[in-house]
């Protein structure tokens, strides 16, 4: 009977574990690439250090309601996933604690929510938290992310557009409503004149 070789067995175990780890890392890289594709090339990276788990969970839920997603990941895997984009020249984004914000519908709305959260959480120090990202697969600086957050959201733009479109209709309705009212007032005045004249 062959003797059990503990070292050879341990080596095989380590090799299998290493292969599982590599496969898991590749799955994560692929999932980040897929998220970027689903978000039409939009992602914003931010430093989440100092944010407790509960507020971060609440932010994630708010972002999810806006059809977005926050992913916390390893910088090396983020870089590997986005190295074939405009972020390849901005490796400094992937230093320190990093989370990625994806938007699957309205990038402005999710960016507004993130900036609002960072302002509430970090007060004056919030600006250094935004690292930059991609908009339509083009690099955007932290300053451009802040500018994006100041734009009106898709819902706000639709409301303004409807307001502009409805203004002439509302004005026409008011004018049409005013004509019979004025006619009634004129007829009442004539009736009063006749009744005064008849007395």
Swiss-Prot record:
PROSITE patterns reported for this sequence: RIBOSOMAL_L10
RNA-binding recorded as keyword: yes
Superkingdom of origin organism: Bacteria
Entry keywords, A to Z: Ribonucleoprotein, Ribosomal protein, RNA-binding, rRNA-binding
Ribonucleoprotein in keyword set: yes
GO MF entries: large ribosomal subunit rRNA binding; structural constituent of ribosome
A Gene Ontology cellular-component term: large ribosomal subunit
Gene Ontology biological-process entries: translation
Function of the molecule: Forms part of the ribosomal stalk, playing a central role in the interaction of the ribosome with GTP-bound translation factors.
Family to which this protein belongs: Belongs to the universal ribosomal protein uL10 family.
Subunit note: Part of the ribosomal stalk of the 50S ribosomal subunit. The N-terminus interacts with L11 and the large rRNA to form the base of the stalk. The C-terminus forms an elongated spine to which L12 dimers bind in a sequential fashion forming a multimeric L10(L12)X complex.
Record-given protein name: Large ribosomal subunit protein uL10
């Amino acid at each position: 009977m062959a003797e059990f070789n503990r070292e050879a067995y341990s080596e095989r175990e380590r090799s299998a574990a290493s292969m599982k780890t590599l496969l898991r890392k590749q799955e994560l890289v692929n999932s980040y690439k897929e998220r970027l594709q689903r978000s039409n090339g939009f992602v914003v990276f931010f430093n989440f250090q100092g944010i407790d788990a509960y507020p971060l969970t609440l932010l994630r839920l708010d972002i999810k309601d806006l059809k977005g997603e926050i992913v916390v990941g390893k910088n090396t895997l983020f870089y590997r996933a986005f190295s074939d984009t405009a972020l390849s020249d901005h490796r400094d984004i992937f230093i320190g604690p990093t989370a990625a914000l994806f938007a699957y519908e309205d990038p402005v709305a999710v960016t507004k929510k993130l900036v609002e959260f960072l302002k509430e959480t970090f007060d004056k120090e919030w600006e250094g938290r935004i690292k930059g990202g991609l908009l339509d697969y083009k690099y955007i600086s932290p300053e451009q992310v802040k500018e994006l957050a100041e734009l009106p959201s898709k819902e706000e733009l639709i409301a303004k557009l409807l307001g502009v479109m409805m203004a002439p209709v509302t004005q026409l309705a008011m004018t049409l409503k005013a004509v019979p009212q004025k006619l009634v007032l004129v007829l009442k005045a004539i009736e009063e004149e006749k009744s005064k004249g008849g007395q």
